[in-house]
From Swiss-Prot:
The lineage of its organism: Eukaryota, Metazoa, Chordata, Craniata, Vertebrata. The gene is Nlrp6. It comes from Rattus norvegicus. Detected in several tissues. Expressed in renal epithelial cells in medullary thick ascending limb of Henle, as well as in salivary gland apical epithelium (at protein level). Isoform 1 is widely expressed. Isoform 2 is primarily expressed in kidney (at protein level). This is NACHT, LRR and PYD domains-containing protein 6. It holds the Pfam family PYRIN. The poly-Lys disordered region (350-354) mediates the formation of liquid-liquid phase separation (LLPS), an essential step for nucleation and formation of the NLRP6 inflammasome complex.
Amino acid sequence: MDAAGASCSSSEAVARELLLAALQDLSQEQLKRFRHKLRDAPLDGRSIPWGRLEHSDAVDLTDKLIEFYAPEPAVDVTRKILKKADIRDVSLRLKEQQLQRLGSSSALLTVSEYKKKYREHVLRQHAKVKERNARSVKINKRFTKLLIAPGSGAGEDELLGTSGEPEPERARRSDTHTFNRLFRGNDDEGPRPLTVVLQGPAGIGKTMAAKKILYDWAGGKLYHSQVDFAFFMPCGELLERPGTRSLADLILEQCPDRTAPVRRILAQPHRLLFILDGADELPTLAAPEATPCRDPFEATSGLRVLSGLLSQELLPSARLLVTSRNATLGRLQGRLCSPQCAEVRGFSDKDKKKYFFKFFRDERKAERAYRFVKENETLYALCFVPFVCWIVCTVLLQQMELGRDLSRTSKTTTSVYLLFITSMLKSAGTNGPRVQGELRMLCRLAREGILKHQAQFSEKDLERLKLQGSQVQTMFLSKKELPGVLETVVTYQFIDQSFQEFLAALSYLLDAEGAPGNSAGSVQMLVNSDAGLRGHLALTTRFLFGLLSTERIRDIGNHFGCVVPGRVKQDTLRWVQGQSQPKVATVGAEKKDELKDEEAEEEEEEEEEEEEELNFGLELLYCLYETQEDDFVRQALSSLPEMVLERVRLTRMDLEVLSYCVQCCPDGQALRLVSCGLVAAKEKKKKKKSFMNRLKGSQSTGKQPPASLLRPLCEAMITQQCGLSILTLSHCKLPDAVCRDLSEALKVAPSLRELGLLQNRLTEAGLRLLSQGLAWPKCKVQTLRIQMPGLQEVIHYLVIVLQQSPVLTTLDLSGCQLPGTVVEPLCSALKHPKCGLKTLSLTSVELTENPLRELQAVKTLKPDLAIIHSKLGTHPQPLKG
């Protein structure tokens, strides 16, 4: 704590004594004039209400001034008001006594004056940012706009895409308008959130966006009328700094000098913005050391200060901008008070190109690199992540300078990161056993840090592993100097947290070389741990799978002189096969479609606890995708007969991963999507087409319909190696574009035998499209399960399927409402000579006397047709999903 904080009580007593003496020197007329001037001359936009001033004597005024402005600022205010009231002799005496007894540090600048000084300081300090290779670049020139999609902090249903989900808001490019909207909330007329969470995966650009927000605030572009002071707080650094500090100390460290009026700044918390970068690094609140701090002047650990801010027990009216990875958002939201969420989605296609031209200073090189990446569809897709885009640009620049073939650039994040390491080593002319040994130690440092939640490393850490001054240290670690209690503390961190996680995964394989007894032990400990796919080691585990591909293992052997035992890969495969059906498969399937009112609150709490489990299935698919080995994926999925994704707002990358796994799945595989968002958010197009282009467009008759978010999955289903046999879509919104793509897939999917459409939001046009696919001559779907309200409005499409489908043998309408207006055309279709249906399931369907009579007549006419209903003499079978 600073000296001012340490002597808080004594300085307050002195300030009170000075104020009381000055005010008691005033006559009744002077005191009255002082009160009026105090009312009419607000400081920093604030003044004491007249109702509290009107009848106050000297003692009352002293109390109110100290309460309203804080002790030392109150002396400054009093001195200036006395001068305005033309009581100059008392003002002069107060100034002299203030200088003698309190010093001049706080008496020179008002908060308004210091605000301008602080903004100028922030503009100077943050005008440049260091890239991962320690090169400094101007933030305005390097920052490339990101797509940011507003989310919701209230209903989980809105975030996760249940059957009642709203249309997702359009992702907007991160200009000042988008940043200004963050604290407005979804409803402009409702209460504005005090906490905004910028969420997104590793390397997506959350930190850069947060720094740009700070820089634009200092430049007067953001929150000008709402925020007087904004402070950037890297959570990882604060957690690892030794000693204790108060929030006031942390604020003072960011100010241009030690004369900052910290107490007056903190006296107006509603005018403050704290940017907490990397809040996912905080441990759980259950530990005693995480008890939130409530006093901004209490010297304590960084964890307690951050916990106090996040829980709003410390400065509850202050604004918070928090960055966090998606995987830990559920755990973080338990600490926050009504947060507004926004998702950082990386670069749009337009901004990918802008980034390339900003990175390459030579326009011809930029054009060549961008054209190459654009032609590599998978690599181009990966470049939506800014850190991956930076690595790709760095590697391509090195290969250009060395005259090498650009085609060696790879297609997964793992392969891109591995190529980055090897390219950096080659460009530096370093190789051989010494550098290989250094790299092993660097990987070990990364692994130690990941396991301990540590991102900052001391010089002693580097010396212990003989990395101090090494070549790999200068290439892959960035140096930081932090103010310490007695001296500057030097720390090191990896160029990006995701890169540290990649090196940690590589460490497991480098350590696997050796005695058979120790070979795969550490790898198995990683994948078997709860953190492996559900916790903070999820990305490390994903990288591990990517490194286990045959091609990557060969690269590791060539570049690092390491032979990875084959049993490591086989043991990992057996681990995947041992997962059987993840817990997520049964979480939603066993729930009733509609919860009772008294159970809703309890169910919501259970969903929060299960949130990380709900990601298990998708995370496992990401791991398999990262291998890019069809045979490995097929073997892994052979023991997982059903893939289930529940309550996931699927992104394009999620669909890319799912589609690859579906393409590789063995015969008999089932896929169930439950309450998944399948609506793509459209990017806003600002430029209008020219008149000629619009004229050409209107004359064109063969325009291709827009692709749906589900198209990659549909394209995977029609490949000959795809063994997907059962597809169930439950409680999903299915736009017409999705139905169109799914219909095309139904026509030719080689293995699909069963389709379930359960409680989805389908339009009449969508069902018409699906019926066309099901009635197609080459469609192989034999079982169709449908649950939907309002079947009477679309029964004619179902009739078409029954009359025209060459292979449909089972129709399950369990749980549907079947009035007479539906049963009559249904029975007519069943009697049709071309209808080959063998089983009609009507479990839990309420039927009146006339429909029952018509169905009985169908049974008499077609004795081979089994109609399952309790009143028709057949036993019901439960509906799956």
